[in-house]
Amino acid sequence: MEHTYQYAWVIPLLPLPVIMSMGFGLFLIPTATKNLRRIWAFPSILLLSIAMVFSLHLSIQQINGSSIYQYLWSWTINNDFSLEFGYLVDPLTSIMLILITTVGILVLIYSDDYMSHDEGYLRFFVYISFFNTSMLGLVTSSNLIQIYFFWELVGMCSYLLIGFWFTRPIAASACQKAFVTNRVGDFGLLLGILGFFWITGSLEFRDLFKIANNWIPNNGINSLLTTLCAFLLFLGAVAKSAQFPLHVWLPDAMEGPTPISALIHAATMVAAGIFLLARLLPLFISLPLIMSFISLVGTITLFLGATLALAQRDIKRSLAYSTMSQLGYMMLALGIGSYQAALFHLITHAYSKALLFLGSGSVIHSMEPLVGYSPDKSQNMVLMGGLRKYVPITRTTFLCGTLSLCGIPPLACFWSKDEILSNSWLYSPFFGIIASFTAGLTAFYMFRIYLLTFDGYLRVNFQNYSSTKEGSLYSISLWGKSISKGVNRDFVLSTMKSGVSFFSQNIPKIPANTRNKIGSFSTPFGAKKTFVYPHETGNTMLFPLLILLLFTLFIGSIGIPFDNGVKDNRILELTILSKWLTPSINLFQENSNSSINSYEFLTNAISSVSLAIFGLFIAYIFYGSAYSFFQNLNFQNSLVKKNPKKSFLDEVKKKIYSWSYNRGYIDFFYTRVFILGIRRLAELTHFFDKGVIDGIINGVGLAGFCIGEEIKYVGGGRISSYLFFFLCYVSLFLFFIP
């Protein structure tokens, strides 16, 4: 087994040959390389598949052997300082290796067809292969300096891929926004690394964990300084995993191609922050203040992400806020010390979210011939609807991914989310209430996405499908030349002027002869004639969806407890995942539930599933075919008092959707406080520099020049000037003599 571990360093390097080959090909023989560009997908997939097989072999050995292997190379700079580089293979590493390689392979296969007509096909495969290499290097790193090196490479690749279509100004601004926002977290991470190096004189994980086990409990070092450095490390994870308040880059990152959105949200960039916290949890767990702060940030993020997803119209941005919320669940689990539940949800969410993003890409691909290739139209759920008849395979896979994320058994995310909910209730009722309520919201907004996309009838002719620029805050423009002047505070997803109501209680009566001319947002009463219809994507794009569907159906089984005997009338818990994670859990002696009561499990499961079903039901009432049915019968108006004033419930509903659609006004706040504030400070500094500093210096120079000119004039050899000053001096002398 040790012989196999010795070659684990090859895994991150396997995708590099194809990257270098494509680079040399584009440089030396560009015409031939571009003409044969589809061939380059095969070696990219092949090499990553070899890495996956190697990773799977290591994982099997981890499960059977339960050991940790670390290999180091030491580079001595001088007698007092040396750098150590190496790789670490433990359960966390093996989990991430399988996650990255499996999702990465499926994304590469999907991209071969999705990007086939794009001029940047080769450039895309170079970027995405290097992205996989960077993430594989990150998870195998044995110390903080290596993690930071690959951390920056991951950020660079995300910058390149988010701005892949850099000729579009909005995409160029989006990658800049992601880069600048992550700079805040990366700066904190670097300061935290330097701080711990100053404390311990080492960057190795074993030395940091020694602090956690020995020095901190015995007050061997300054706990305040250690807490500050740990907070700075956590700041890096906050930015990379899109946690509040550094989450604003994530929805705008959807400007990149859809396959890279799947990779970023499933297995690479946003997973890097969770991985960093999981790797350093033995250190954080000895700092109760930091653990409380982590759980608080996770709780805020999971609730905020769910509320911001409620009213989004862009299918990819809705899924992006869903990712933000689910990452909040993982952060909460790590904050309360539930290491196994956090990693379990990381695994299940990765496959479910990859399925959803690739499914959304299939939907976008099928809509583009109808509405055009502008993301404002092809990704707008308002113009979709009724796609279940045209893309049945995509619809089935998307529905399974949706139900998984909603927490419906026996799909993957049910098992992991239920474990997080149970542990959060045990840790704090406050966290349990927020997490459980958000689980219901998750079911609501996820089923909303499904219904608006696949239910009802096709709405390609729907008018007023997007709000005006003056009416809403487009945060992506904050990083460009223009800045939105206002915020739409009264926006609700409705079209009042056209007589079509989305959430209005006062629904106008629609004459029979006009029902075929007006389309409801949720489900139109009739579809206009069109000669072009959406079509199912090719087999190359459907194959990854079907494989991810299998993962979504069965990956949850690794966390299902099996009977391992009875002790004190309780069934001892044994899962594949717990056996897999045994060495890592032993590092910090996680006080997890070593046993499980079947009654407690059923109680928790019934409550969580009930919340999910309730959310699904409410979403169907508002967005499904039932809404159109009630609207035609004028059913809702019979339940509401008819008065000219809007009801209180309608106002609350309006404010909630205005909050959600405008991203909680957080981007607006950042614009006013930070961006415009920094610009005004820069203008004030420029004025002070030019007006005051330069004014004083120029004034001194001018005064010296004038004095010199006067002296030159006086000493110019004129007798009259000499007599004048002589008389002046004599007069002053006589004046002061008493």
Swiss-Prot record:
Pfam families according to UniProt: Proton_antipo_C, Proton_antipo_M, Proton_antipo_N
EC numbers on record: 7.1.1.-
Recorded GO MF terms: NADH dehydrogenase (ubiquinone) activity; quinone binding
Residue runs in coiled coils: none
InterPro entries in UniProt: NADH_UbQ_OxRdtase_chlpt_su5_C, NADHpl_OxRdtase_5_subgr, ND/Mrp_TM, NU5C-like, Proton_antipo_N
Cellular compartment(s): Plastid, Chloroplast thylakoid membrane
Membrane protein topology class: Multi-pass membrane protein
Role this protein plays: NDH shuttles electrons from NAD(P)H:plastoquinone, via FMN and iron-sulfur (Fe-S) centers, to quinones in the photosynthetic chain and possibly in a chloroplast respiratory chain. The immediate electron acceptor for the enzyme in this species is believed to be plastoquinone. Couples the redox reaction to proton translocation, and thus conserves the redox energy in a proton gradient.
NCBIfam families: NDH_I_L (TIGR01974), PRK06590.1 (NF005141)
Subunit structure: NDH is composed of at least 16 different subunits, 5 of which are encoded in the nucleus.
Family: Belongs to the complex I subunit 5 family.
Listed name of the protein: NAD(P)H-quinone oxidoreductase subunit 5, chloroplastic
Organism: Sorghum bicolor
